[in-house]
Amino acid sequence: MADARRAPLKDRTDVSGARALIVEARFYDDIQDALLEGAVAELSAAGVSYDVVTVPGALEIPAAIAIALDAAERSGKPYDAVVALGCVVRGDTIHFEIVSMESSRALMDLSVQRRVPLGNGIITVNTDAQAWARARASELNKGGDAARAALTMLRIKRRLAKA
């Protein structure tokens, strides 16, 4: 049975037709545009449809995800995966640490408790230059990375459901 649950690093389990939720924090609009572009490109390439929900900041992302997951389940059209996108830039106070740690913790809790494949694309940086390097699809493409993480976890979930 262990071999049946092992997958190659490049798992190609079909996820086309899946439905994803992207929740984005629009605190830094231009950076967010770049993160969203990367995530959308990855989901679209995999044949995954998506809905986008926009919230004011990173701390609101987990609550919006929980609300959307509940609504989708009640409607009979549950989401198969979730992508969280946002940007937190360090300032002069401990706000950075609070937002970074609490949003990440809440996302992990949601993913584990709800068994939902989730890619965390909330970038945490010291400078605007670091944010741009991480957000642009032509550079580090962290929006794309978050979508790929969600898709990888969805593939694992689907493969293990068949094992």
UniProtKB/Swiss-Prot annotation:
Keywords linked to the UniProt accession: Riboflavin biosynthesis, Transferase
- Per UniProt, what is one Pfam family of this protein? DMRL_synthase
- The main enzyme category here is transferase
The entry's cellular-component GO terms read:
cytosol; riboflavin synthase complex
**Which domain of life does the UniProt lineage start with?**
Bacteria
| GO biological process terms on file | riboflavin biosynthetic process
Binding of 5-amino-6-(D-ribitylamino)uracil occurs at: F27, A58, L59, E60, C87, V88, V89, N120
Where is the catalytic site? Answer: H95 (proton donor)
Amino-acid positions noted as binding (2S)-2-hydroxy-3-oxobutyl phosphate in the UniProt annotation, renumbered to this chain = D92, T93, R134
Functional description taken from the UniProt entry: Catalyzes the formation of 6,7-dimethyl-8-ribityllumazine by condensation of 5-amino-6-(D-ribitylamino)uracil with 3,4-dihydroxy-2-butanone 4-phosphate. This is the penultimate step in the biosynthesis of riboflavin.
Q: What is this protein called?
A: 6,7-dimethyl-8-ribityllumazine synthase
From what organism does this protein derive?
A: Nitrobacter hamburgensis (strain DSM 10229 / NCIMB 13809 / X14)
Higher taxonomy: Bacteria, Pseudomonadati, Pseudomonadota, Alphaproteobacteria, Hyphomicrobiales
